[in-house]
Amino acid sequence: MALESALPSLRELAGGKPLIGTSVQTQFGKLYTPEETNLLATQFDSVTPENCMKWQYLCPKEGVYRFEPVDLLIDFATRNRQKAVGHTLIFNRDGNYPDWLFRDGGKEADAKLVWQRVEDHAAKLMSRYAGRIDSWDVLNEFIEVPSPGYRVTDLTRVLGADYPERLFKIAARIDPKAKLTCNDFAVERPDRLKAILAFVRSLRDKGCKIDVVGSQSHLEIGDNAVYAALGINRVMPRPGLCRVRKLEAANPGVWHSIPYSHAA
Protein backbone atom coordinates (compact mmCIF):
# COMPACT_ATOMS: atom_id res chain seq x y z
CA MET A 1 0.00 0.00 0.00
CA ALA A 2 1.37 3.42 -0.92
CA LEU A 3 2.17 5.68 2.00
CA GLU A 4 -0.36 8.33 0.92
CA SER A 5 -3.20 5.80 0.81
CA ALA A 6 -2.44 4.73 4.39
CA LEU A 7 -2.69 8.28 5.72
CA PRO A 8 -5.91 10.20 6.40
CA SER A 9 -6.72 12.85 3.82
CA LEU A 10 -6.79 16.57 4.53
CA ARG A 11 -10.59 16.59 4.35
CA GLU A 12 -10.75 13.67 6.82
CA LEU A 13 -8.37 15.39 9.24
CA ALA A 14 -10.33 18.66 9.09
CA GLY A 15 -13.68 16.93 9.46
CA GLY A 16 -15.43 19.77 7.68
CA LYS A 17 -14.21 22.39 10.18
CA PRO A 18 -12.98 24.12 8.12
CA LEU A 19 -13.73 22.92 4.63
CA ILE A 20 -10.49 22.36 2.71
CA GLY A 21 -10.59 23.61 -0.85
CA THR A 22 -8.39 24.09 -3.88
CA SER A 23 -8.51 25.77 -7.27
CA VAL A 24 -8.67 23.67 -10.42
CA GLN A 25 -7.43 24.61 -13.86
CA THR A 26 -9.73 23.15 -16.51
CA GLN A 27 -10.08 25.66 -19.34
CA PHE A 28 -8.31 23.33 -21.76
CA GLY A 29 -11.08 20.76 -21.42
CA LYS A 30 -9.31 18.21 -19.24
CA LEU A 31 -8.25 17.73 -15.67
CA TYR A 32 -4.92 16.33 -14.62
CA THR A 33 -3.00 13.06 -14.52
CA PRO A 34 -4.72 10.13 -12.78
CA GLU A 35 -2.55 10.70 -9.70
CA GLU A 36 -3.38 14.41 -9.56
CA THR A 37 -7.05 13.73 -10.18
CA ASN A 38 -7.07 11.27 -7.28
CA LEU A 39 -5.50 13.90 -5.01
CA LEU A 40 -8.17 16.42 -6.01
CA ALA A 41 -10.92 13.90 -5.34
CA THR A 42 -9.68 12.62 -1.98
CA GLN A 43 -7.96 15.56 -0.29
CA PHE A 44 -10.41 18.43 -0.72
CA ASP A 45 -13.97 19.30 0.33
CA SER A 46 -14.46 21.96 -2.33
CA VAL A 47 -13.11 22.97 -5.72
CA THR A 48 -12.96 26.39 -7.37
CA PRO A 49 -12.36 27.02 -11.07
CA GLU A 50 -9.17 29.02 -11.45
CA ASN A 51 -10.00 30.74 -14.74
CA CYS A 52 -12.57 28.91 -16.85
CA MET A 53 -15.57 30.66 -15.26
CA LYS A 54 -14.13 34.15 -15.61
CA TRP A 55 -16.07 36.10 -18.20
CA GLN A 56 -13.23 36.69 -20.68
CA TYR A 57 -12.54 32.93 -20.90
CA LEU A 58 -16.13 31.76 -20.64
CA CYS A 59 -17.57 34.06 -23.30
CA PRO A 60 -14.82 35.65 -25.43
CA LYS A 61 -17.36 36.39 -28.19
CA GLU A 62 -20.81 37.77 -27.48
CA GLY A 63 -23.36 34.97 -27.25
CA VAL A 64 -20.74 32.20 -27.55
CA TYR A 65 -20.24 30.43 -24.21
CA ARG A 66 -17.61 27.80 -23.49
CA PHE A 67 -19.35 25.82 -20.78
CA GLU A 68 -17.57 22.51 -21.34
CA PRO A 69 -14.63 23.16 -18.95
CA VAL A 70 -17.00 24.39 -16.23
CA ASP A 71 -19.33 21.43 -16.71
CA LEU A 72 -16.33 19.12 -16.41
CA LEU A 73 -15.40 20.60 -13.04
CA ILE A 74 -18.95 20.67 -11.65
CA ASP A 75 -19.49 17.05 -12.69
CA PHE A 76 -16.20 16.12 -11.02
CA ALA A 77 -17.26 17.82 -7.79
CA THR A 78 -20.66 16.11 -7.85
CA ARG A 79 -19.12 12.67 -8.31
CA ASN A 80 -16.75 13.21 -5.41
CA ARG A 81 -19.29 14.80 -3.03
CA GLN A 82 -17.47 18.12 -3.09
CA LYS A 83 -18.82 21.64 -3.04
CA ALA A 84 -18.16 23.80 -6.09
CA VAL A 85 -17.54 27.54 -5.80
CA GLY A 86 -18.65 29.91 -8.55
CA HIS A 87 -15.67 32.12 -9.33
CA THR A 88 -16.47 34.73 -10.40
CA LEU A 89 -19.39 36.79 -11.74
CA ILE A 90 -17.51 40.09 -11.95
CA PHE A 91 -13.76 40.56 -11.51
CA ASN A 92 -13.27 44.30 -11.11
CA ARG A 93 -10.03 44.51 -13.03
CA ASP A 94 -9.56 45.56 -16.64
CA GLY A 95 -8.70 42.54 -18.76
CA ASN A 96 -10.93 40.24 -16.72
CA TYR A 97 -14.02 40.73 -18.86
CA PRO A 98 -14.38 40.49 -22.64
CA ASP A 99 -13.69 43.48 -24.87
CA TRP A 100 -17.11 43.23 -26.52
CA LEU A 101 -18.79 44.10 -23.21
CA PHE A 102 -18.12 47.79 -23.85
CA ARG A 103 -18.70 47.88 -27.61
CA ASP A 104 -21.90 48.62 -29.54
CA GLY A 105 -20.99 48.13 -33.17
CA GLY A 106 -18.43 50.78 -33.98
CA LYS A 107 -19.07 52.89 -30.89
CA GLU A 108 -18.80 52.58 -27.13
CA ALA A 109 -21.71 50.86 -25.40
CA ASP A 110 -23.73 52.97 -23.01
CA ALA A 111 -24.48 52.02 -19.41
CA LYS A 112 -27.92 50.61 -20.28
CA LEU A 113 -26.47 48.09 -22.75
CA VAL A 114 -23.58 47.13 -20.46
CA TRP A 115 -26.00 46.54 -17.58
CA GLN A 116 -28.19 44.38 -19.80
CA ARG A 117 -25.15 42.29 -20.73
CA VAL A 118 -24.07 41.98 -17.10
CA GLU A 119 -27.54 40.84 -16.05
CA ASP A 120 -27.86 38.42 -18.97
CA HIS A 121 -24.45 36.94 -18.14
CA ALA A 122 -25.29 36.51 -14.46
CA ALA A 123 -28.62 34.90 -15.29
CA LYS A 124 -27.14 32.50 -17.84
CA LEU A 125 -24.33 31.43 -15.54
CA MET A 126 -26.11 31.22 -12.19
CA SER A 127 -29.25 29.60 -13.59
CA ARG A 128 -27.25 26.90 -15.36
CA TYR A 129 -25.62 25.77 -12.10
CA ALA A 130 -28.39 26.53 -9.61
CA GLY A 131 -28.49 23.77 -7.01
CA ARG A 132 -25.02 22.56 -7.97
CA ILE A 133 -23.06 25.67 -7.00
CA ASP A 134 -24.17 26.93 -3.61
CA SER A 135 -21.63 29.74 -3.20
CA TRP A 136 -20.79 32.50 -5.68
CA ASP A 137 -17.96 35.01 -5.68
CA VAL A 138 -20.22 37.77 -6.97
CA LEU A 139 -17.63 40.55 -6.87
CA ASN A 140 -13.87 40.13 -6.92
CA GLU A 141 -11.24 42.74 -5.97
CA PHE A 142 -13.29 45.93 -5.91
CA ILE A 143 -11.52 47.80 -3.11
CA GLU A 144 -8.46 49.98 -3.61
CA VAL A 145 -6.86 52.29 -1.05
CA PRO A 146 -6.17 55.13 -0.61
CA SER A 147 -8.51 57.43 -2.57
CA PRO A 148 -10.89 56.89 -4.31
CA GLY A 149 -11.46 53.72 -2.26
CA TYR A 150 -12.19 51.43 -5.20
CA ARG A 151 -10.25 50.12 -8.17
CA VAL A 152 -11.00 52.37 -11.15
CA THR A 153 -11.87 50.22 -14.17
CA ASP A 154 -13.92 50.38 -17.33
CA LEU A 155 -16.81 48.99 -15.27
CA THR A 156 -16.69 51.78 -12.70
CA ARG A 157 -16.24 54.33 -15.49
CA VAL A 158 -19.31 53.15 -17.44
CA LEU A 159 -21.60 51.86 -14.66
CA GLY A 160 -20.44 54.06 -11.79
CA ALA A 161 -18.71 53.19 -8.56
CA ASP A 162 -22.02 52.11 -7.03
CA TYR A 163 -22.54 49.22 -9.47
CA PRO A 164 -21.81 46.53 -6.79
CA GLU A 165 -25.16 47.28 -5.10
CA ARG A 166 -27.15 46.47 -8.20
CA LEU A 167 -24.90 43.49 -8.99
CA PHE A 168 -25.52 41.81 -5.62
CA LYS A 169 -29.26 42.42 -5.90
CA ILE A 170 -29.27 40.85 -9.37
CA ALA A 171 -27.41 37.79 -8.08
CA ALA A 172 -29.75 37.37 -5.10
CA ARG A 173 -32.77 37.54 -7.38
CA ILE A 174 -31.42 34.94 -9.83
CA ASP A 175 -30.47 32.33 -7.21
CA PRO A 176 -32.00 33.19 -3.81
CA LYS A 177 -30.63 30.01 -2.21
CA ALA A 178 -26.98 30.60 -3.09
CA LYS A 179 -24.49 32.09 -0.65
CA LEU A 180 -23.11 35.33 -2.06
CA THR A 181 -19.52 36.38 -1.47
CA CYS A 182 -17.67 39.67 -1.69
CA ASN A 183 -14.09 38.66 -2.38
CA ASP A 184 -11.01 40.81 -1.87
CA PHE A 185 -7.31 40.66 -1.08
CA ALA A 186 -4.84 41.93 1.53
CA VAL A 187 -7.37 41.90 4.38
CA GLU A 188 -4.40 41.61 6.73
CA ARG A 189 -3.54 45.26 5.99
CA PRO A 190 -5.36 47.54 8.46
CA ASP A 191 -6.19 50.19 5.85
CA ARG A 192 -7.62 47.66 3.41
CA LEU A 193 -9.48 45.77 6.14
CA LYS A 194 -11.13 49.00 7.28
CA ALA A 195 -12.15 49.85 3.71
CA ILE A 196 -13.48 46.36 2.99
CA LEU A 197 -15.51 46.27 6.21
CA ALA A 198 -17.00 49.70 5.50
CA PHE A 199 -17.83 48.68 1.93
CA VAL A 200 -19.57 45.44 2.94
CA ARG A 201 -21.44 47.16 5.77
CA SER A 202 -22.68 49.89 3.42
CA LEU A 203 -23.96 47.34 0.89
CA ARG A 204 -25.73 45.31 3.56
CA ASP A 205 -27.30 48.51 4.91
CA LYS A 206 -28.71 49.09 1.40
CA GLY A 207 -30.39 45.70 1.43
CA CYS A 208 -27.75 43.65 -0.37
CA LYS A 209 -27.44 40.00 0.52
CA ILE A 210 -23.77 39.33 1.31
CA ASP A 211 -23.31 36.08 3.20
CA VAL A 212 -19.54 35.75 3.07
CA VAL A 213 -16.44 37.91 2.86
CA GLY A 214 -13.74 36.05 0.96
CA SER A 215 -10.08 36.63 1.71
CA GLN A 216 -7.49 36.19 -1.01
CA SER A 217 -4.61 35.69 1.38
CA HIS A 218 -1.23 36.31 -0.20
CA LEU A 219 0.66 36.39 3.08
CA GLU A 220 4.18 36.86 4.33
CA ILE A 221 5.41 35.71 7.71
CA GLY A 222 4.20 38.23 10.27
CA ASP A 223 0.96 39.22 8.52
CA ASN A 224 -1.83 39.31 11.08
CA ALA A 225 -4.52 37.41 9.20
CA VAL A 226 -6.20 36.17 12.39
CA TYR A 227 -7.20 39.68 13.45
CA ALA A 228 -8.36 40.39 9.91
CA ALA A 229 -10.72 37.40 10.04
CA LEU A 230 -12.07 38.51 13.41
CA GLY A 231 -12.68 41.98 12.01
CA ILE A 232 -14.61 40.63 9.04
CA ASN A 233 -16.84 38.58 11.31
CA ARG A 234 -17.98 41.78 13.04
CA VAL A 235 -20.02 42.85 10.01
CA MET A 236 -21.42 39.49 8.94
CA PRO A 237 -24.95 38.32 9.78
CA ARG A 238 -23.63 35.24 11.54
CA PRO A 239 -20.19 34.57 13.05
CA GLY A 240 -17.61 32.53 11.23
CA LEU A 241 -18.43 33.64 7.68
CA CYS A 242 -15.00 34.80 6.64
CA ARG A 243 -13.68 32.32 4.08
CA VAL A 244 -10.13 32.04 2.83
CA ARG A 245 -10.46 31.89 -0.95
CA LYS A 246 -6.72 31.86 -1.62
CA LEU A 247 -3.81 31.16 0.68
CA GLU A 248 -0.10 31.18 0.25
CA ALA A 249 2.46 32.18 2.85
CA ALA A 250 6.00 33.25 2.02
CA ASN A 251 8.96 34.09 4.20
CA PRO A 252 10.92 36.73 2.28
CA GLY A 253 13.91 36.20 4.55
CA VAL A 254 14.37 32.62 3.37
CA TRP A 255 16.09 32.45 0.00
CA HIS A 256 14.72 29.01 -0.83
CA SER A 257 11.11 29.80 0.04
CA ILE A 258 9.84 29.35 -3.52
CA PRO A 259 10.94 25.75 -4.14
CA TYR A 260 10.10 24.70 -0.60
CA SER A 261 6.69 26.37 -0.75
CA HIS A 262 6.04 24.63 -4.04
CA ALA A 263 7.04 21.29 -2.60
CA ALA A 264 4.73 21.81 0.36
Regions found by a protein language model. Give the residues of each.
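Low-complexity, Gly/Pro
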Residues: 1-2, 173
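Short, acidic/polar
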Residues: 26-43, 70, 115-126, 191-203, ...
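Boundary/entry segment of secreted carbohydrate-active catalytic domains
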Residues: 2-50
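Substrate-binding cleft and catalytic face of glycoside hydrolase catalytic domains
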Residues: 7-8, 42, 46-60, 69-188
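Short helix-terminating capping/connector loops at secondary-structure junctions
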Residues: 15-16, 79, 131, 208
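Acidic-and-aromatic substrate-binding clefts and catalytic sites of carbohydrate-active enzymes
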Residues: 3, 23-34, 55-68, 143-147, ...
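Glycoside hydrolase catalytic-domain groove-lining segments
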Residues: 75-83, 157-183, 190-264
